[in-house]
């Protein structure tokens, strides 16, 4: 599979990006680079700065870690460009046209817009280079909460109530009655709980819409769902098998400043705990795993996804799907598969091999 002199597969780890999840992407990339088997893989780091410049990436994974609550960023180095020509697939060139490196496969560790939303997947599809994770359609649909829910609902999967705001800031009285209080106001295309507000009084609604709209012109307003927060990973093997991890139960998510699982609570404050496997009865566990796989298939995902649920008194309700979940040391996706018997290094190996063996 490799044309490298070492005989190893060359993996371009692309990270950073223009989204508000830039720093999380950097930490995920550092963990991935540290865990890719050096006997099988050569890592080619490619960073994308917050203003969108593609640059030679950091070679030391330790520099892409969370240190004293300080999140890393891609620094400006010598710029590189990916080739879009299938005759030169996998090549990255410096500004003067000279070759930086040639990759056999791309691992786009990009969270949020301009990376997890199908844009980068489409870019690399132009040159026929294998890419880890879902393709253009699944990535775009998974990034947009409106269309995620529409596709899930069309497949008969359980989703909550929501209203979409495109060019308005107010809800009608009928919509307020439909949703009730509290509601969550979110950017329709975002992640890591950035730009999200929990609204308990309608007089605070406009401010919440303004915050969400700072990250996305389209806003989704969701009814609060009372239940336990449970996550489940999905992994596709090179032979096409799709498996679900043991689920994880999150506790302490309400301790964020806004009363929910916000960015600081996820990555900085160290107050959320996860029970893996989740202490659920066998029937509920199997149902969550089944729904996770069905969600993966409903969006035509490939490779991987993390599916988030609320487990209510009436059963599980799908919250969202992440087509490139976090790979940080505290991220649920690798932890859930480790608890399922798939170690971090093996997980990465499966993902890279799945990308190389699929029909691109």
From Swiss-Prot:
Subcellular localization(s) per the UniProt record: Cytoplasm
Cofactor list: Mg(2+); Mn(2+)
Cellular component, GO, one term: cytosol
Sites where the protein binds Mg(2+) 1: 308, 320
InterPro entries: ATP-grasp, ATP_grasp_subdomain_1, D-Ala_lig_Van_CS, D_ala_D_ala, Dala_Dala_lig_C, Dala_Dala_lig_N, PreATP-grasp_dom_sf
Top-level taxonomic group: Bacteria
Keyword Manganese among UniProt keywords: yes
GO BP terms, alphabetized: cell wall organization; peptidoglycan biosynthetic process; regulation of cell shape
The UniProt record lists the keyword Manganese: yes
Binding site for ATP: 176-231
Pathway in which this enzyme or protein is active: Cell wall biogenesis; peptidoglycan biosynthesis
EC id: 6.3.2.4
MF terms (GO), sorted A to Z: ATP binding; D-alanine-D-alanine ligase activity; metal ion binding
Protein's job: Cell wall formation.
Family to which this protein belongs: Belongs to the D-alanine--D-alanine ligase family.
Protein name: D-alanine--D-alanine ligase
């Amino acid at each position: 599979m490799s044309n490298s002199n070492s005989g190893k597969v060359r993996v371009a780890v692309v990270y950073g990006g223009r989204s508000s999840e830039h720093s999380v992407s950097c930490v995920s990339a550092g963990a991935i680079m540290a865990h890719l088997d050096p006997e099988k893989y050569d890592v080619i780091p490619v960073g994308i700065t917050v203003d969108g410049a593609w640059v030679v990436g950091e070679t030391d994974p330790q520099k892409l870690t969370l240190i004293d609550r300080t999140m890393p960023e891609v620094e400006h180095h010598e710029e590189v460009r990916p080739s879009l020509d299938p005759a030169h697939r996998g090549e990255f060139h410096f500004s003067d046209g000279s070759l930086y490196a040639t990759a056999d496969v791309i691992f786009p560790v990009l969270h949020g817009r301009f990376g997890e939303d199908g844009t980068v997947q489409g870019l690399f599809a132009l040159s026929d280079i294998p890419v880890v994770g879902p393709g253009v359609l699944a990535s775009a649909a998974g990034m947009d909460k409106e269309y995620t829910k529409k596709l899930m609902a069309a497949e008969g999967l359980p989703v909550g109530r929501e209203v979409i705001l495109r060019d308005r800031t107010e809800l009608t009285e009928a919509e307020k009655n439909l949703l009730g209080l509290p509601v969550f106001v979110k950017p329709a295309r975002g992640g890591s709980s950035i730009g999200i507000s929990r609204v308990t009084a309608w007089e605070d609604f406009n401010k919440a819409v303004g915050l969400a709209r700072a990250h996305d012109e389209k806003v989704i307003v969701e009814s609060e769902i009372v239940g336990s927060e449970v996550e489940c990973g999905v992994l596709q093997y090179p032979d096409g098998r799709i498996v679900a991890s043991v689920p994880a139960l999150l506790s302490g998510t309400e301790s964020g400043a806004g009363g929910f699982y916000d960015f600081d609570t996820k990555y900085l404050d160290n107050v959320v705990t996860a029970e893996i496997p989740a202490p659920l009865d066998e029937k509920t566990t199997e149902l969550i795993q089944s729904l996770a796989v069905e969600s993966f298939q409903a969006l035509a995902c490939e490779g991987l996804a993390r599916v988030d649920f609320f487990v209510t008194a009436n059963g599980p309700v799908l919250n969202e799907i992440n087509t490139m979940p976090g790979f940080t040391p505290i991220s649920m996706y690798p932890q859930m598969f480790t608890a399922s018997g798939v170690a971090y290094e093996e997980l990465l190996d499966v993902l890279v091999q799945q990308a190389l063996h699929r029909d691109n």
